[in-house]
Curated annotation (Swiss-Prot):
Subcellular locations according to the entry: Nucleus
Limits of the bHLH domain: 45-95
Pfam family, one: HLH
PANTHER family, per the entry: BES1-INTERACTING MYC-LIKE PROTEIN (PTHR46412), TRANSCRIPTION FACTOR BIM2 (PTHR46412:SF6)
Chain intervals with Basic and acidic residues compositional bias: 33-44, 51-60
GO cellular component: nucleus
Subunit structure: Homodimer. Interacts with the N-terminus of BZR2/BES1.
A biological process term (GO) from this entry: DNA-templated transcription
Tissue spec: Expressed constitutively in roots, leaves, stems, and flowers.
Name of the protein this chain belongs to: Transcription factor BIM2
Induction of the gene: Repressed by heat treatment.
Region ranges (Disordered): 1-60, 271-311
Length: 311
């Protein structure tokens, strides 16, 4: 009985050893297969990333080739890449020859390689000069905006405010007086001539009383009030005004050989007080004191020097 039990135990132990030996290599193969599957997954992920980037790169290349095909005239869509690039090179060389030809005919242009940026800058400069304000010189009209060379010229123009075409206004903080004087006999002594400033209120009162229609008409027509500045009157306007004034004084019976005649134009805040004068083409630009004229013409020529005010 003991021997039978011992044999049975030995058989059971042998079967366990055989089963353990048989299960050992199968577990090793499963571990290796798991590792291989992980490595394959990593490799496939890397390949997919590379494929995505490659697809993007190829799509960009195709888009740029399509742009080139649209730029080049008479290009065939079925050509291969090499022949198409050769056609692009030929077209670029043709454009360079044209540019060199036109640059040779205009020596003032720069000899640097031509690019798109300078062409765009020149085109923008021409368009901006077309709408740029140009100052008027002496009221005659607009001058030449860009004389000389095309690229070397920088045109700068400042906006000018002009009240009248022939009377430009120069801005100044203090009021200035433009005086026009005539001396018939320079050797005469000026000691007997009184100053002009005390007679200003009398002239203001006379002009306001005797010429209401003129002051009202000019006050309605000229709405611009000049707070300060200088008006430069042209020589033709000055001579015409002076001749009309001289003629008016001679008609009044004043001897100009014994008098000094001066015309002063003062601009300022007094322009609203109705101190105006008629146009230089009128026959009577000044108003005279009738009482002084009746008393003595010579006394009026020596003591009453009229002062004109203009807007």
């Amino acid at each position: 009985m003991r021997t039978g039990k011992g044999n049975q135990e030995e058989e059971d132990y042998g079967e366990e050893d055989f089963n353990s030996k048989r299960e050992g290599p199968s577990s090793n193969t499963t571990v290796h297969s798991n590792r291989d599957s992980k490595e394959n997954d990593k490799a496939s992920a890397i390949r997919s990333k590379h494929s995505v980037t490659e697809q993007r790169r190829r799509s960009k290349i195709n888009e740029r080739f399509q742009i080139l095909r649209e730029l080049i005239p008479n290009s065939e869509q079925k050509r291969d890449t090499a022949s198409f690039l050769l056609e692009v090179i030929d077209y670029v060389q043709y454009l360079q020859e044209k540019v060199q030809k036109y640059e040779g005919s205009y020596p003032g242009w720069s000899q640097e390689p031509t690019k798109l940026t300078p062409w765009r800058n020149n085109h923008w400069r021409v368009q901006s000069l077309g709408n740029h304000p140009v100052a008027i010189n002496n009221g005659s009209g607009p001058g030449i905006p860009f004389p000389g060379k095309f690229e070397d010229n920088t045109v700068t123009s400042t906006p000018a405010i002009i009240a009248e075409p022939q009377i430009p206004i120069e801005s100044d903080k203090a009021r200035a007086i433009t005086g026009i004087s005539i001396e018939s006999q320079p050797e005469l002594d000026d000691k007997g001539l009184p100053p002009l400033q005390p007679i200003l209120p009398m002239v203001q009162g006379e002009q306001a009383n005797e010429c209401p229609a003129t002051s009202d008409g000019l006050g309605q027509s000229n709405d611009l009030v000049i707070e300060g500045g200088t008006i430069s009157i042209s020589s033709a306007y000055s001579h015409e005004l002076l001749s009309s004034l001289t003629q008016a004084l001679q008609n009044a019976g004043i001897d100009l050989s014994q008098a000094k005649l001066s015309v002063q134009i003062d601009l300022g805040k007094r322009a609203n007080q109705g101190l105006t004068h008629e146009e230089p083409s009128s026959k009577n630009p000044l108003s005279y004191d009738t009482q002084g004229r009746d008393s003595s013409v010579e006394e009026e020529s020596e003591h009453s020097h009229k002062r004109m005010k203009t807007l």
